[in-house]
Curated annotation (Swiss-Prot):
Tagged with keyword Signal: no
Keywords for this protein: Oxidoreductase
Organism, scientific name: Amycolatopsis methanolica
Origin: domain of life: Bacteria
Keyword Protein transport: no
Protein name (record): Formate ester dehydrogenase beta chain
Subunit structure: Heterotrimer composed of an alpha, a beta and a gamma chain.
Molecular function per GO: oxidoreductase activity
Gene3D superfamilies xref list: Uridine Diphospho-n-acetylenolpyruvylglucosamine Reductase, domain 2 (3.30.43.10)
EC number assigned by the record: 1.2.99.-
Length: 21
């Protein structure tokens, strides 16, 4: 998927997911 799509859906959630990694 396009990163922009994730940022549009929920940047906070994505950021947390990245930290989880």
């Amino acid at each position: 998927m396009i990163p922009a799509a994730f940022d549009y859906v929920a940047p906070s959630t994505v950021d947390e997911a990245v930290q989880a990694l």
